[in-house]
């Protein structure tokens, strides 16, 4: 629209990756680069020169490492925790990133969740499937709708799916009653310091899909929170504040909370763009 590149500039911040962190004499240091972000689809950022500094010199570190939660993720939270002890605000709190698995954390609010089972025991999982007939199976450390399976009643692939997901009974997974409301999409509610942003992103699955995730090809519509969305947010919010989880995304399908995203929640840009 004739806007200059300078006018489209959104922010200037310092940027670092996991590989940029080191510990020297008991203090976490980082190789930092200035990062300028532009509202431009083709050239959306520019990087500056590197410089070394203690993380304790920063006011805030926004930690946005995607799952899976592996040992490198674990080590990164420990390195960042040194800066946290020295007064830097880490978003989200390091201990809570380690403690709050995005699938399991939701089970702390059973009044908000659909019928589900967490197990690696094939017998228990098959019994859950027999009880509910139409079930979603998913790993505990995935993201973006990866490795999620819907298994209906009498599906001949049940055994091989469970063998694959559980690695023959060695890996714990989640089984969740299929929610027909997913046909109308799932809802991403963004939580800031335990309070829900008043608008959410309804993510609609592609034709023939069970997943509304944008990473799985879903499309998004920004809309006001429903009464049920607000109620779920009110149940979860105090615990988020207590745990220092300042920036979180709730996934809601119909009337049910399905996940609490604490590592790298998305959809804020889509909501901001639609509602300013």
Identify the function of each model-found stretch:
Residues 65-68, 140-142, 265:
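Short glycine-rich anion-binding loops that position phosphate/pyrophosphate groups of nucleotides
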Residues 14, 90-91, 136, 174-176:
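Structural detector of well-ordered beta-strand residues that form the stable sheet scaffold
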Residues 94-97, 203-205, 253-256:
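Short glycine-enriched loops at secondary-structure junctions
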């Amino acid at each position: 629209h004739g806007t200059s590149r300078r006018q489209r500039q959104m922010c200037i911040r310092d940027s670092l990756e996991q590989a940029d962190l080191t510990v020297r004499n008991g203090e976490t240091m980082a190789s930092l680069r200035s990062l300028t972000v532009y509202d431009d689809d083709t050239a959306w950022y520019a990087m500056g020169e590197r410089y070394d500094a203690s993380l304790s010199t920063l006011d805030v570190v926004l930690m946005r490492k995607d799952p899976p939660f592996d040992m490198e993720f674990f080590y990164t939270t420990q390195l960042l925790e040194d800066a946290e002890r020295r007064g830097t605000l880490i978003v989200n709190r390091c201990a809570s990133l380690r403690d709050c698995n995005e699938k399991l954390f939701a089970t702390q609010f059973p009044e908000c969740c659909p019928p589900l089972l967490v197990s690696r025991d094939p017998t228990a999982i098959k019994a859950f499937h027999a009880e509910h007939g139409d079930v979603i199976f998913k790993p505990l450390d995935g993201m973006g709708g990866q490795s999620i399976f819907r298994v209906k009643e009498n599906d001949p692939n049940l055994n091989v799916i469970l063998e694959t997901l559980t690695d023959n009974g060695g890996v714990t997974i989640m089984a969740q009653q299929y929610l027909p409301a997913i046909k109308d999409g799932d809802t991403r509610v963004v939580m800031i310091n335990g309070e829900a942003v008043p608008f959410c992103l309804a993510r609609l699955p592609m034709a023939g899909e069970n997943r509304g995730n944008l990473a799985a090809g879903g499309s998004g519509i920004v809309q006001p929170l429903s009464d049920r969305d607000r109620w779920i947010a009110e149940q979860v919010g105090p615990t988020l504040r207590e745990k220092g989880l300042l920036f979180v995304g709730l996934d809601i399908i119909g009337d049910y909370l399905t996940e609490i995203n604490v590592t790298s929640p998305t959809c804020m840009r889509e909501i901001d763009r639609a509602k300013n």
